[in-house]
Amino acid sequence: MKTKILNLANEEIGEISLNEDIFAVEFIRDDIIKQVVDWQRAKAMAGTHKTKTVSEVSGTTKKPFKQKGTGNARQGSLRSVQMRGGGVIHGPVVRSHATKLPKKVRKLGLIHALSEKFSEGKLLVIDSLKLETPKTSNLVNILNKFQGKSFFVIDGNEVDVNFSLAAQNIYNTVVVPQIGANVYDIIRHEYVLLSQEAVNVLEERLK
């Protein structure tokens, strides 16, 4: 399967053959894509939420008032869960939200996400993702030629330093080497831009 190669001016300069088993899967498995996205988002959660239990709340352990004769319900501690400023029962604790997902499923998710973008006509192959200077304004002008609202840019094994620096302050634009290609960023950005080197490395990695 062939597709056109563009330059950074959005001009066609040639053709490249793409592996249909990676970029043109016939039946897109949205369920697999969702599984991988859920796995990614769970793994990214900090898990630093925490409330204090009765034993952790600061305060006295003295009985607030005598057992009998006050007309109030008996109380043993001001740190009890029913007291204002007391502990929290069954509250969140610091933990990892990460789950396990087989490598084959993760690989399938990436293949189906790339195929979905290609079927929409929003996966573009660029001859080279290199800039002479790290000027954000220059890169903004380049991306405007593709008429997209958001871009996920995937380069080869290494990202051009000037391109990476220029993209840092551009809203909804993420630049990664091929090892950083992931399902969540592919589906949440409107366009995916792949360098020729990225295509070759991804085909080798996902075959």
Curated annotation (Swiss-Prot):
Give one GO term, molecular function aspect.
rRNA binding
Describe its partners and assembly state: Part of the 50S ribosomal subunit.
The cross-references to SUPFAM superfamilies, in alphabetical order and at most eight, read: Ribosomal protein L4
**Family per similarity comment:** Belongs to the universal ribosomal protein uL4 family.
User: What does the protein in this record do?
Assistant: One of the primary rRNA binding proteins, this protein initially binds near the 5'-end of the 23S rRNA. It is important during the early stages of 50S assembly. It makes multiple contacts with different domains of the 23S rRNA in the assembled 50S subunit and ribosome.
**What HAMAP family would the database entry show?**
Ribosomal_uL4_B
Keywords, A to Z, come to: Ribonucleoprotein, Ribosomal protein, RNA-binding, rRNA-binding
The organism's taxonomy opens as: Bacteria, Pseudomonadati, Pseudomonadota, Alphaproteobacteria, Rickettsiales
- Which GO biological process entries does UniProt record here? translation
Q: What is this protein called?
A: Large ribosomal subunit protein uL4
Cross-referenced InterPro entries, in alphabetical order? Ribosomal_uL4, Ribosomal_uL4-like, Ribosomal_uL4_dom_sf
Identify the stretch(es) annotated as Disordered.
53-76
> What Gene Ontology terms describe where this protein resides (cellular component)?
ribonucleoprotein complex; ribosome
